[in-house]
UniProtKB/Swiss-Prot annotation:
<dbReference type="InterPro" id="IPR020557">
    <property type="entry name" value="Fumarate_lyase_CS"/>
</dbReference>
<dbReference type="InterPro" id="IPR029419">
    <property type="entry name" value="Arg_succ_lyase_C"/>
</dbReference>
<protein>
    <recommendedName>
        <fullName>Argininosuccinate lyase</fullName>
        <ecNumber>4.3.2.1</ecNumber>
    </recommendedName>
</protein>
<dbReference type="InterPro" id="IPR008948">
    <property type="entry name" value="L-Aspartase-like"/>
</dbReference>
<dbReference type="Pfam" id="PF14698">
    <property type="entry name" value="ASL_C2"/>
</dbReference>
<dbReference type="GO" id="GO:0005829">
    <property type="term" value="C:cytosol"/>
</dbReference>
<dbReference type="GO" id="GO:0042450">
    <property type="term" value="P:arginine biosynthetic process via ornithine"/>
</dbReference>
<keyword id="KW-0456">Lyase</keyword>
<keyword id="KW-0055">Arginine biosynthesis</keyword>
<dbReference type="InterPro" id="IPR009049">
    <property type="entry name" value="Argininosuccinate_lyase"/>
</dbReference>
<keyword id="KW-0963">Cytoplasm</keyword>
<dbReference type="InterPro" id="IPR000362">
    <property type="entry name" value="Fumarate_lyase_fam"/>
</dbReference>
<comment type="pathway">
    <text>Amino-acid biosynthesis; L-arginine biosynthesis; L-arginine from L-ornithine and carbamoyl phosphate: step 3/3.</text>
</comment>
<dbReference type="InterPro" id="IPR024083">
    <property type="entry name" value="Fumarase/histidase_N"/>
</dbReference>
<keyword id="KW-0028">Amino-acid biosynthesis</keyword>
<dbReference type="GO" id="GO:0004056">
    <property type="term" value="F:argininosuccinate lyase activity"/>
</dbReference>
<comment type="similarity">
    <text>Belongs to the lyase 1 family. Argininosuccinate lyase subfamily.</text>
</comment>
Length: 459
């Protein structure tokens, strides 16, 4: 008989038990469920709601139940629906009818909200640490490539030369925002819903703040209806995870391109690539492709959660059982990607010569010729038109700007002098952009110093 079965005259259909059960996935919350129950029973003892002897017996029984679950010795059954009822049934089997006192002043509605908040609190800390490791791997690559010049792109067309280190640092700061978003979300995650009951609170003289303090929460959810209805914190976690996945996917797209023969900018280590069952020569960037591909899973979980919530009246509805699998899978998917990413980036080889060749054989120094003419007195629009004509001439003659003679340059403007050849070199183009945040070496070094300071302060 189910623990809530007193009002019913017949057992639940076996197919309903199987369909409605969540134990196959919410068993992941077992340790958090028991952690919450230990705090709850300590509060029941403190407030003299149940006898101290019973509370102590329940607490010891919960610890035994946890050890059995962790050892794989506990039988978790669809008949008891979810982790909460399974734990309570195991507790009663362990300590007898006194275990039935545990649920005094509590509902599964506030209990599950508590478990999920405890779970996400740990997950956010774990993912934040993994993100910092990825940031450090990118900084390591940046430091090793302070003199590596590559094409910068807009519209996937070569635009202006940049340092490879500058490109790496762009992602460092993207991931920094991701860490900050996760950390900021803790303000909303780290509130205790316990004591809200099913929806309206409880008639027992409980101490919600005691439970919150025992569990390390910053405070309590202020409204009992909101406490059991709220899944904003799950949506926010999924949204933050989707943004991390977006940033990882963008970098993976570049790694896939850069590692191709068409670019030949980087070589991923053999340990992060795979071969072909048919083509012996192949070295495929499967890890980068999978990280890119699995981003869709995380997006899907976010949309699924929003869609589940959009039509729900207050307070708890069984639809909300669907809030966990997406949360669990988003965590595991993102965790797997981040665990692979740092060592993949650290072991990646950068083809400096290929990058330099690419940036030399193009027109990405055209803006610098235009800026040069502005400094000689032209308006930017005038210089833009003049340089456009020069580029067109080069294209027609199968030349690049640095292939032109001074005489040819002067056909476009008499103000151009011999110094133009130094101005248009890739290294000069890069180092001319010394504005804060720019691609010049001194600017990138400042970015690295700031990023390292942020990582150090987060320890």
């Amino acid at each position: 008989m189910k623990l809530w079965g007193g009002r019913f005259t017949k057992p639940t259909n076996e197919l309903v038990d199987e369909y409605a059960s969540s134990i196959q996935f919410d068993k992941k919350l077992a340790a958090y469920d028991i952690e919450g129950s230990l705090a709850h029973v300590a509060m029941l003892k403190k407030c003299e709601i149940i006898p101290a002897e019973d509370a102590d017996k329940i607490a010891e029984g919960l610890k035994i139940v946890l050890s059995k679950i962790e050892a794989g010795e506990a039988e978790l059954s669809n008949e008891h629906e979810d982790i909460h009822m399974n734990v309570e049934k195991l507790l009663i089997d362990e300590v007898g009818p006194v275990g039935g006192r545990l649920h005094t002043g509590r509902s599964r509605n506030d209990q599950v909200a508590l478990d999920m908040r405890l779970y996400l609190r740990d997950v956010i800390a774990e993912l934040s640490d993994l993100l910092k490791a990825v940031q450090q791997s990118l900084i390591t690559q940046a430091k090793a490539n302070m003199d590596t010049v590559m094409p910068g792109y807009t519209h996937l067309q070569r635009a202006q030369p940049v340092l490879f280190a500058h490109h790496m640092m762009a992602y460092v700061f993207m991931f920094q925002r991701d860490v900050e978003r996760f950390q900021d979300s803790l303000k909303r995650v780290n509130k205790s819903p316990l004591g809200a009951g099913a929806l309206a609170g409880t008639t027992f003289p409980i101490d919600r703040h005691f439970v919150a303090e025992q569990l390390g929460f910053d405070g309590i959810c202020e409204n009992s209806l909101d406490a059991v209805s709220d899944r904003d914190f799950v949506v926010e976690f999924l949204s933050n995870s989707a943004l991390v996945s977006t940033h990882l996917s963008r970098l993976c797209e570049e790694l896939v391109q850069w590692s191709s023969a068409e670019f030949n900018f980087v070589e991923l280590d053999d340990s992060f690539t795979t071969g072909s069952s048919m083509m012996p020569q192949k070295k495929n960037p499967d890890v980068a492709e999978l990280v890119r591909g699995k981003t869709g899973r995380v997006y899907g979980h976010l949309m699924g959660m929003l869609t589940t919530l959009k039509g729900l009246p207050l307070a708890y509805n069984k639809d909300m059982q669907e809030d966990k699998e997406g949360m669990f899978d988003a965590h595991e998917t993102l965790k797997g990607a981040l665990q692979l990413f740092a060592p993949m980036m650290e072991s990646m080889k950068v083809n400096k010569e290929s990058m330099y060749k690419a940036v030399s054989n193009d027109y990405s120094n055209a803006t610098d010729l235009a800026d040069y003419l502005v400094n000689k007195g032209m308006t930017f629009r005038e210089s833009h038109a003049v340089v456009g004509e020069a580029v067109l001439h080069c294209i027609e003659q199968n030349k690049y700007l640095l292939d032109l003679t001074l005489k040819e340059f002067k056909q476009y403007s008499e103000v151009i002098d011999e110094d133009i050849f130094d101005v248009l070199k890739p290294e000069a183009v890069v180092n001319a952009r010394s504005v804060e945040g720019g691609t010049a070496k001194e600017s990138v070094l400042q970015q690295i110093a700031k990023a390292e300071k942020l990582l150090e302060s987060a320890k």
